[in-house]
Regions:
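Short, acidic/hydrophobic/Gly-rich beta-strand patch recurrent on exposed beta strands
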Residues: 37-42, 204
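OB-fold single-stranded nucleic acid-binding module
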Residues: 24-34, 46-50, 54-102
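Acidic/His-rich, divalent-metal-binding segments that scaffold phosphate/diphosphate chemistry
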Residues: 97-216, 257
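Divalent metal-dependent catalytic cores for phosphoryl transfer on phosphate-bearing substrates
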Residues: 153-155, 164, 174-294
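OB-fold nucleic-acid-binding modules
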Residues: 1-15
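Divalent metal-coordination and catalytic microenvironments
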Residues: 19, 66, 169, 278
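Acidic, carboxylate-rich catalytic segments that either coordinate divalent cations
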Residues: 267-327
């Protein structure tokens, strides 16, 4: 199936395309002025529909989040934001379209697995290698880890996003640990395991969403429980209790502060490094996503036309110079 790049659509362009219905919202503007707006998704991104007003809302009465629909429409613009003016929409049967073609993805994950497994094999301590093997030598775990997004929306919100994110965190963290004379192998373990709770926190078979337990407990707590459960299932114990506590602490503290979701604040050098490496990967990915999306800019402008939510109320700047380098 041909994938239209939603970030490069021109006003007036007509589309006939299968989309994943990412969201359905009813918006009220006072009195009886209600409208329905669909958010449609494919592997390249998302676009909102033009509002369906009044009786016209019946056209999308059977459309719900997570369905796949065949859409015919024309790209329009309202207040500087592109939207799809839908002339026809119908729900497609399950299985007619491969969902992987409608979801954002990191693409080929081989490069991330190659680096991750190379780092694991170089870990000096046999007990630490054993702990990591409890997870990454498990084929079911690897299959889930390879697919899971790092977030439903936000940084690395794509199939394989978690694998890409932890690879970045490990690369950043190991370098800082080397400079700071920290334990590189322990840092690696924390980087690879800090977000394992997201496997139980999110669903990704269609729209990326939180599970019930994900909303109730959060990925930090779920990750801690998963880690404890795996170690208890292993006989004899793969490592000393004190060693396990160091990794548990990194899982529980990687958000840095309680108000940002940490169960405790970092108390070890490796936990402190992990927190900032995690943040660096997330923030850099968010900035790159904003700057790569032409819908955030007016024409050839270098500064974003708005303050994207990913940048916490800041604008972005995409200007680049060659510094005299000859191409």
């Amino acid at each position: 199936m041909t994938i239209h790049n939603l970030k490069q659509l021109a006003v007036g362009e007509r589309l006939q395309h299968a989309f994943l219905v990412w969201d359905v919202q009813t918006r009220s503007y006072g009195g009886d002025k209600d409208c329905t707006v669909l958010t449609l998704s494919n592997a390249s991104g998302r676009i909102e529909s033009a509002p369906f007003w009044g009786a016209d809302q019946q056209r999308v009465a059977g459309i719900s989040k997570g369905l796949v629909a065949q859409v015919i429409g024309e790209v329009g613009e309202f207040r500087g934001k592109r939207q799809l003016c839908i002339s026809s929409i119908r729900v497609l049967p399950d299985g007619q379209v491969d969902l992987s073609e409608l979801l954002p993805s990191v693409g080929n994950t081989e490069q991330y697995w190659r680096k991750l497994d190379e780092w694991r094999q170089a870990v000096a301590g046999p007990r630490l290698r054993k702990v990591l093997g409890l997870f990454f030598d498990d084929d079911d775990f690897r299959r889930q880890f390879e697919q899971c997004p790092a977030s439903p929306v936000g940084h690395h919100a794509e199939l394989g996003g978690l694998l890409k994110h932890v690879t970045e965190v490990a690369a950043i963290g190991r370098m800082i640990a080397r400079i700071s004379k920290g334990d590189e192998d322990l840092l690696l373990a924390g980087a690879l395991l800090h977000d394992i709770g997201k496997l139980e926190c999110y669903t990704w078979n269609g729209v990326f969403e939180y599970t019930d337990v994900g909303r109730l407990c959060g990925h930090v707590v779920l990750g801690s429980l998963m880690f404890d459960r795996r170690l208890r299932e292993c006989t004899p114990a793969p490592c000393l209790d004190g060693e396990a506590n160091l990794i548990q602490h990194m899982i529980l503290s990687h958000h840095g502060k309680e108000e940002f979701g940490a169960a405790v604040r970092p108390m070890t050098l490796e936990a402190e490094i992990l927190h900032y490496a995690d943040n660096a990967s997330a923030k850099a990915a968010s900035m790159a996503e904003v700057l790569d999306d032409p819908t955030n800019f007016n024409a050839e402008a270098l500064v974003t036309s708005k303050k994207p939510w990913q940048l916490d109320g800041r604008r972005g700047y995409r200007g680049r110079f060659d510094w005299g380098v000859e191409s």
